[in-house]
Regions:
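Amphipathic protein-protein interaction modules
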Residues: 52-110
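Hydrophobic, Leu/Ile/Phe/Ala-enriched alpha-helical segments that form helix-helix packing faces
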Residues: 41-49, 79
């Protein structure tokens, strides 16, 4: 893993380059507040939790929370040094290598990790999420 290169990538990644759909905006706005331990863990890898590569939302659950099944993040360098982990937070969150992900057109060594499960309040007012 190249933690410094990963940090640089996330520092340079502007919010305007992220998906602007309501589901992604909700994720970006809420995830760090809802999951401080996961946020801190991802920071040790150089990853900014509020800048996901992919979010994968479902539909609101009975409690009015939006479940995200496997939000994904880019990590630079080789997979060597990365180990799957369980982070204790609001709920236990698994951090692991993604088995599939969208294409990214990045030409330098990197890999994709995913975290799950994530449950967030729905706070994007102008749009009602599906229940």
């Amino acid at each position: 893993m190249d933690i410094e290169r990963t940090k640089q990538f996330y520092r340079d990644l502007k919010r305007s380059n992220l998906c602007d759909c309501a589901y992604c905006r909700n994720y970006v706005n809420e995830v760090a507040k809802a999951y401080p331990a996961v946020t801190a863990y991802l920071q040790t890898l150089g990853v900014d939790i509020a800048k996901p590569f992919e979010t994968m939302p479902l539909e609101l659950d009975e409690a009015g929370r939006m479940p995200y099944i496997g939000p994904q993040y880019l990590v630079f360098g080789e997979e060597e040094g990365f180990a799957a982990a369980t982070v204790r937070d609001v709920n236990d969150v698994e951090v692991r290598l993604a088995q599939s992900h969208p294409g990214d057109n990045i030409q330098e060594p990197h890999f994709v990790i995913e975290i799950e499960p994530i449950f967030l309040p729905w706070t994007v007012e102008e749009t009602k999420a599906k229940q």
